[in-house]
């Protein structure tokens, strides 16, 4: 039996380095990843270290609102 609907939701992770720097002067764009999270296990905002092709390094990517 399922306890509830929509336990796993799709979230968008955005590079915090690109947003903070106002997008690099060299290239335009902001790195975004799409992933899923379980609301019961992680009720707060998700933050992961992912590779940003615009910053050319691994940076923190935080969950954004849809």
From Swiss-Prot:
Q: Where is it chiefly localized?
A: plastid
Q: Which GO terms describe its cellular component?
A: chloroplast; ribonucleoprotein complex; ribosome
Pfam families per the UniProt record, alphabetical = Ribosomal_L33 (PF00471)
Keywords tagged on the record: Chloroplast, Plastid, Ribonucleoprotein, Ribosomal protein
Q: Supply the Gene3D superfamilies for this chain.
A: Ribosomal protein L33
Cell compartments where the protein resides: Plastid, Chloroplast
- Which BP terms does GO give this entry? translation
This protein's record includes keyword Ribonucleoprotein = yes
Q: Which InterPro entries match?
A: Ribosomal_bL33, Ribosomal_bL33_CS, Ribosomal_bL33_sf, Ribosomal_zn-bd
User: Which Gene Ontology terms cover its molecular function?
Assistant: structural constituent of ribosome
Q: Which family does it belong to?
A: Belongs to the bacterial ribosomal protein bL33 family.
- In Swiss-Prot or TrEMBL terms, this protein is called Large ribosomal subunit protein bL33c
Q: Which organism is it from?
A: Daucus carota (Wild carrot)
Source organism lineage?
A: Eukaryota, Viridiplantae, Streptophyta, Embryophyta, Tracheophyta
